[in-house]
Amino acid sequence: CQYTLNDDKLVDFLDYFEEKGVGVINASPFAMGLLSQRGVPEWHPAPAALVEACRKASDYCLSQGYPIEKLAIQYSVSNPRIGTTLFSSANPDNVLKNIQYIEEPIDWDLVAKVKEIIGDQQRVTWKNT
């Protein structure tokens, strides 16, 4: 979850990884549900302020006719220095939809607006237990 609409800290380490010859795998472009219309599961460890900021971003995307899931996966695969982004779904239709989203051009103006909505919750992370 380190190259997503709400947290792009991974870019801070790309030069180091490249110097060391380390390939990078990004995962969880939907930030474990933060960046989805479905919302986060109860067990999600993100702080409440981040959950709320992502909900507002999702609502805004929906008001623009652009599902946040689409923007989230497009953003997560947009950096050519990150060769792989993993996502999962139990629903084959969602897998196909995500592949379709990846092939479509990203709306960078909407990315900027979503990052503005997320605001000071950008790059906020949580403790893993």
Regions inferred by a protein language model and the residue ranges of each:
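Beta/alpha (TIM)-barrel catalytic core signal, keyed to glycine-rich beta->alpha loops juxtaposed to Asp/Glu
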Residues: 1-128
